[in-house]
Amino acid sequence: MNWRDIIYSNPNIYGGKPVFRNSRITVEMVLDLMAAGWTLEQMSDEFPGILPEHVPAAAAFAAEMIHDEQALASSRARAA
């Protein structure tokens, strides 16, 4: 599964924060719930718009953002 298939950003929705397609559920919210120890069942019960594929997509999105940030930091360090 490619997170790009279900996560996107629109400047008119939450100021451009990444959200899941066909919803106003932010990736940030799902990651926060995951970090707080919520299960998928708890998330879905409390927020019916959260789907099973949202959890791995949010994790993949976060991992890629970290990799990109590390690459950028490394590039900056070499340039300095």
Regions found by a protein language model. Give the residues of each.
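Long, charge-rich, low-complexity alpha-helical segments
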Residues: 25-80
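Anion-recognition interface
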Residues: 22
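Basic, low-complexity segments
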Residues: 1-15
